[in-house]
């Protein structure tokens, strides 16, 4: 698949000028004639690089404030012309072959992300000539090289040096794929932006002129990893990441050691990391099958880990551990000496901790970096034939948001524990019940079809591990439809309940709490998780 083509003439027109002077200089030193436009041509000329303005080559000036620069047959004919087939036509019309196109596009995404961006600003940053040249060159990759990414500049020069100033068909094809990916992403961003400017469908409020959800939903992801298999061994799988993933995520984490992350590893690590981000104090979250099985705070992460592990040592076996502070050697030692673990993730990992974990070479050790903001954007769930798209669940309550609805007022400690286990319940699969005391989970009931059984399971798990439920707080991710969940909690020893409220039978549920001498707190916010 060699079919090398020499590079004799290149057209360069870039918005992002990172590395372009050095690249153009390298091309010129290798005898490549350079065509260019506007600001790119001026920059190259200022740096002493011989350059021909496209307008001089075509005999047609740039016009309309730069809107029309490269849209000319002498440009596109030179790019699209098939070598050996269109040569006579090109010669007849004075069209020179263009062997390489170096283009990146107007910064549309950066423009619309700016505060105060107007529709007029956005429109002026829609590139027309650029995508046209990119697609033309990519279509004719049999003869023409297209370069859209600055990180490919060195690769191109290296191959030219190794291949008598030529590039192979394999390289041209690979660069063409990158070009089509680039224009697809660009057009998708534009469609998304304009698509939010139409009224919402369905539940549209009166006067709502725009929707945050575009008419068509375009997102592009890049394959980061092929996997041995998916959720089950008979399923093929791969891991894709966003073009610009957010800080401190499983997608951006650096793997320090261990086997390749599996499909389930990635899903569970994401659940653990997003949960531990909720806490400012030293915290540890242990996750198994996407559910927290132990969460705790401590004076340091070692204490937090010891307490989180104490919740459910059985389920912690083969789990995922996440911290919100640097992993130190003492904590790493406690983990590897105590239990089998799949993944450990922390914002940073000390050199000493790396050395400790290295003794268990299969343990996947990840460093995700610090986070400064909450995760934003959309949650997407695939259904057969469609997507469910929603805001991420960023909702959380503070002390001032709580409404005590029982006769008994919660104590200061109960309020503190209520806020702690409410944060945990947000990350437990519905129906979710969490028992907690002293900034430590005591029992977790997850994923049951009836809320009362989740409450019973939380109590059973606490009893199995010898943990004292009496005096604990219970959090429920949604309201109690009946009083039976409160009765089950009281039987286990729960003294305070935090829940959204909003049931048709709230009065019965509150009455049950009063009968048992419980404090009951309403948050007014639900945290279903499916």
From Swiss-Prot:
Biological process, per Gene Ontology: 'de novo' IMP biosynthetic process
Coiled-coil regions listed in the entry: none
GO cellular component assignments: cytosol
Pathway note: Purine metabolism; IMP biosynthesis via de novo pathway; 5-formamido-1-(5-phospho-D-ribosyl)imidazole-4-carboxamide from 5-amino-1-(5-phospho-D-ribosyl)imidazole-4-carboxamide (10-formyl THF route): step 1/1; Purine metabolism; IMP biosynthesis via de novo pathway; IMP from 5-formamido-1-(5-phospho-D-ribosyl)imidazole-4-carboxamide: step 1/1
Single annotated GO MF: IMP cyclohydrolase activity
Catalysed transformations (reactions): (6R)-10-formyltetrahydrofolate + 5-amino-1-(5-phospho-beta-D-ribosyl)imidazole-4-carboxamide = 5-formamido-1-(5-phospho-D-ribosyl)imidazole-4-carboxamide + (6S)-5,6,7,8-tetrahydrofolate; IMP + H2O = 5-formamido-1-(5-phospho-D-ribosyl)imidazole-4-carboxamide
Comment field on protein domains: The IMP cyclohydrolase activity resides in the N-terminal region.
Similarity field: Belongs to the PurH family.
Protein name per UniProt: Bifunctional purine biosynthesis protein PurH
Organism this protein belongs to: Vibrio campbellii (strain ATCC BAA-1116)
């Amino acid at each position: 698949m060699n079919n090398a083509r020499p590079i004799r003439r290149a057209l360069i027109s870039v918005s992002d000028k990172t590395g372009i002077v050095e690249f153009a200089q390298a091309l010129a030193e290798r005898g490549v004639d350079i065509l260019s436009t506007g600001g790119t041509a001026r920059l190259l000329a200022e740096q002493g690089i011989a350059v021909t303005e496209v307008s001089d080559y075509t005999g047609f000036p740039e016009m309309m404030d730069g809107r029309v620069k490269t849209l000319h047959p002498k440009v596109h004919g030179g790019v699209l012309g098939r070598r050996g087939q269109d040569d006579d036509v090109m010669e007849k019309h004075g069209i020179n072959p263009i062997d390489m196109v170096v283009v990146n596009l107007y910064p549309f995404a950066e423009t619309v992300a700016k505060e105060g961006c107007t529709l007029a600003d956005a429109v002026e940053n829609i590139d027309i000539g650029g995508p046209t040249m990119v697609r033309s060159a990519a279509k004719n990759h049999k003869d023409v090289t297209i370069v859209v990414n600055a990180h490919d500049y060195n690769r191109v020069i290296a191959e030219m040096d190794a291949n008598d100033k030529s590039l192979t068909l394999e390289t041209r094809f690979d660069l063409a794929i990158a070009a089509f990916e680039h224009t697809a992403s660009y057009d998708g961003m534009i469609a998304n932006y304009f698509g939010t400017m139409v009224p919402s469908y369905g539940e549209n409020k009166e006067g709502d002129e725009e929707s945050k959800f575009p008419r068509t939903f375009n997102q592009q992801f890049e394959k980061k990893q092929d996997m041995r298999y998916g959720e089950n061994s008979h399923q093929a799988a791969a891991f894709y990441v966003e073009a610009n993933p957010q800080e401190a995520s499983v997608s951006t984490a650096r793997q320090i050691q261990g086997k390749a992350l599996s499909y389930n590893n990635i899903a569970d690590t994401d659940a653990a990391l997003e949960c531990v981000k909720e806490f400012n104090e030293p915290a540890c979250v242990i996750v198994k099958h996407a559910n927290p099985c132990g969460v705790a705070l401590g004076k340091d992460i070692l204490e937090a880990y010891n307490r989180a592990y104490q919740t459910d040592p059985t389920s912690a076996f083969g789990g995922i551990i996440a911290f919100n502070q640097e992993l130190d050697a003492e904590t790493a030692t406690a983990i590897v000496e105590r239990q089998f673990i799949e993944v450990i993730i922390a914002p940073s990992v000390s050199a000493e901790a790396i050395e400790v974990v290295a003794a268990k070479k299969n343990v996947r050790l990840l460093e995700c970096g610090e986070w400064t903001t909450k995760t934003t954007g959309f949650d997407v769930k695939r259904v057969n034939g469609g997507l469910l798209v929603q805001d991420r669940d960023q909702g959380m309550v503070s002390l001032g948001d709580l409404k005590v609805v029982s006769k008994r007022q919660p104590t200061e400690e109960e309020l503190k524990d209520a806020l702690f286990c409410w944060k945990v319940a947000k990350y437990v699969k519905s129906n979710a019940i969490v028992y907690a005391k002293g900034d430590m989970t005591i029992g977790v009931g997850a994923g049951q079809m009836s809320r009362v059984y989740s409450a019973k399971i939380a109590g059973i798990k606490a009893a199995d591990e010898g943990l004292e439920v009496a005096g604990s707080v219970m959090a429920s991710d949604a309201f109690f439809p009946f009083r039976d969940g409160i009765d089950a909690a009281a039987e286990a020893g729960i003294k305070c309940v935090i829940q959204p409220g909003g049931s048709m039978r709230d009065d019965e549920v509150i009455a049950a709490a009063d009968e048992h001498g419980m404090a009951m707190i309403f948050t007014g916010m639900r945290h279903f998780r499916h």
